[in-house]
Design a protein with these regions (language model features):
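Extended, loop-rich substrate-binding clefts of extracytoplasmic carbohydrate-active enzymes
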Residues: 612-649
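Hydrolase catalytic cores
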Residues: 235-238, 258-265, 285-289, 312-313, ...
Length: 649
């Protein structure tokens, strides 16, 4: 008797076609054309095809023939980038190789999804993604609250009695540009004296006359956008000239800033991640990102990892102004300090996002600061909160010049003040606004607390990755202490869901010195899923990390169990079978699911699905593209797809 596995997809059926067909089509829920730069795609070539890559393009007949049909042109996005030092791969935090990233622009009247599909099918690329347009995390003006109350609340003024920063410490302001003639900003610009205005690239960095920053979109030194004051506003918070008897005070005090303009000429934040690379490459050890998007991307992950791991820069980003728990990027990427906002009463700012991804809070309401042209205004948003942390990071980094970026980030988080959680209006956000409110003084002066982070988080079952009712999940991670020694460290797992029973909820870390790591792979946390777990149940796991001296910090892991899709994993081949008539991925934008993949080549297609046709009609039932970006939804789920063993004799 032979056992054979069969994937059963329960689909809506009926006697006549007219009874089943759902005529309505729907736009893709993940992004629209307005969310992306038109006819532009970010591509990363797989390392095994490095020999095909040149500064001018990719030496592939198939790729070049396709580019010819779509009027496409490739450009190496970061031509000055170098491959990471091999030693960086030996540490817990892995570097990013951005040397094989290209940007494709095409002229044909084709939707992004169709071009991405064709490129993905070649198997040459790690990823092919839209170039998402970022949004600034800014709220409207409120002229009745003009003051700098946050300086005292964050104890920045007391911190200045300890340390006032250093002019060699530079904050990269990746934003809409800066009013370089603003009386409160001009003195703190970091000038590149090695490249005077003479039409020559004197310093050989690939940029001509980049004396005071760079305009990434226009590829020139015009870093001022008279129509958009966002960058001028955020810059003043971190970097305004302090103790000069006029205007406002920047938290970074003596620390300088480098303006890196990322918008086009009509206000679209279209070269945001490119700006991060420029800042990192030009010596900025702190980089502020008061912008973001609800769309994650592999391109974004690469850039953040490059800045933090390869270039040792602290990256700070706004949590977003959507007043929800949805992740916002780059703030929610690993290694970024994710900053939410409070109002003057220490309540969560009405617009600030919140959630398990938040690291720290600062102030995002009633912020009085610099504005175009050479003036001041009161405004807010998490755009304002992020540069407060950036200014503090610059102070701290210059105070401890040998500290690495991640150590600085952990010190800022571990010294944050959690007292604001006691404000009644904040009780509903318990643990979801980070470790606490930025405390600049304590960040400079605390010499006792360790800081343990959980890296490489993973959830596994019986290796089919389906997480079904009755399964036992094994949750693992690598725990690293970034700062001072920790004694008697313990990790305790909790989950509030009634469908998760934890049978191994603690792991002993023992004693960890600075930079020590320990993994629980051999002794994982174990969680049993209830037999009555509903379909697509979200679970949120909370890891409380404690150590002697009152140290206590939270880490989170979230996943969806009993999904309405199934991974069929046989040898080197993985296929995801959803319950809605699609194949490979549940949704038309290649998520969620593994697609149809072989070894480490990634999915061999972008979208696929079952189709039934009636020649006499002619009519077709399917869940694939109609006229992009519209997508047919003719099939529906009766029961979730499941795997079962049957006897074949």
């Amino acid at each position: 008797m032979i056992k054979k596995y069969v994937a059963l997809a329960a689909l809506v059926t009926a006697v006549s076609f007219s009874a089943i067909a759902q005529v309505a089509q729907y736009a893709l829920p993940n992004f629209t054309d307005a969310d992306c730069e038109a006819k532009t795609i970010n591509l990363k070539v797989k390392d095994q095809y490095r020999n095909l890559c040149t500064a001018a393009g990719i030496n592939s007949t198939a790729i070049n023939n396709y580019l010819g049909t779509i009027g496409g042109a490739l450009q190496l996005t970061f031509p000055n980038a170098k491959q990471p030092d091999k030693k960086l791969y030996e540490q817990a935090e892995k570097p990013a190789d951005i040397t094989l990233i290209y940007r494709l622009k095409y002229t044909a009247n084709l939707p992004l999804r169709k071009v991405i599909n064709a490129l993905t099918a070649t198997g040459l690329f790690v990823y092919a993604e839209p170039n998402y347009i970022m949004q600034k995390c800014y709220t409207v003006n409120d002229a009745s609250l003009g003051n700098q109350y946050y300086i005292g609340q964050l104890k920045a003024d007391q911190a200045w009695d300890v340390w006032k920063g250093d002019t060699n410490m530079v904050i990269g302001i990746t934003d809409s540009g800066v009013d370089t003639n603003h009386v409160d900003l001009k003195p703190n610009i970091k000038y590149n004296y090695n490249d005077p205005y003479n039409g020559i690239d004197d310093d050989g960095d690939g940029y001509i006359d980049n004396r005071r920053g760079w305009n990434i979109w226009a590829n020139n030194d015009n870093v001022y956008d008279a129509q958009d004051s966002h960058g001028t506003f955020t810059t003043g918070i971190s970097s305004a000239k302090t103790d000069n008897g006029i205007g406002v005070a920047g938290i970074g005090f003596k620390c300088k800033f480098l303006p890196v303009r990322l918008d086009d000429n009509v206000g679209n934040y279209i070269r945001a991640y490119d700006a991060v690379v420029y800042a990192a490459d030009h010596g900025c050890k702190v980089i502020n990102c008061s912008w973001g998007s609800r769309f994650p991307s592999n391109f974004g992950v690469d850039i953040i990892n490059y800045a933090v791991i390869n270039k040792d820069a602290v990256v700070i980003a706004s949590a977003g102004n959507d007043n929800n728990q949805e992740p916002f990027y780059p703030a929610s990427f690993q290694y970024v300090i994710n900053v939410a906002g409070l109002n003057q009463s220490n309540q969560k700012s009405p617009t600030s996002s919140w959630g398990a991804n938040i690291d720290i809070v600062a102030y995002g309401s009633g912020i009085y600061n610099t504005y175009n042209p050479n003036t001041y205004v009161t405004s807010g948003g998490t755009s304002a909160a992020a540069p407060m942390v950036s200014g503090a990071a610059a102070l701290l980094r210059s105070y401890y010049p040998t500290w690495k970026a991640l150590k600085v980030a952990e010190q800022l988080k571990v010294t944050a003040d959690p007292a604001f959680y006691s404000v009644p209006q904040n009780l509903q956000y318990a643990t979801k606004l980070g470790k606490g409110r930025l405390d600049v003084l304590k960040a400079l002066t605390d010499t006792t607390s360790p800081s343990i982070a959980m890296l490489n988080k993973a959830a596994k079952d019986n290796n089919d990755r389906n997480f079904l009712p009755g399964d036992t999940l094994r949750l693992t991670g690598l725990f690293k202490n970034y700062i001072r020694p920790a004694t008697n460290g313990v990790v305790t797992l909790t989950c509030t869901s009634p469908y998760a029973t934890i049978i191994n909820n603690t792991f002993s870390l023992g004693n960890l010195n600075q930079n020590d790591t320990i993994s629980n792979t051999s002794n994982p946390f174990k969680v049993i899923l209830a037999n009555n777990t509903p379909v697509n149940t979200p679970l949120e796991f909370k890891f409380a990390i404690t150590a002697d001296g009152g140290y206590n910090v939270l880490e989170w892991m979230a996943d969806t169990v009993n999904r309405n899709r199934m991974n069929i994993d046989v040898g080197n081949v993985v296929l995801t079978v959803p319950s809605n008539g699609s194949v490979g991925f549940t949704n038309p934008y290649a998520t969620p699911g593994a697609g149809f993949s072989y070894k480490d080549y990634g999915s061999l297609f972008y979208t696929s699905g079952f189709m039934v046709g009636e020649a006499a009609g002619p009519k077709v039932m399917d869940n694939v593209y109609a006229t992009p970006p519209n997508y047919d939804a003719d099939w529906g789920q009766v029961n979730p797809v499941r795997r079962r063993a049957i006897d074949v004799t």
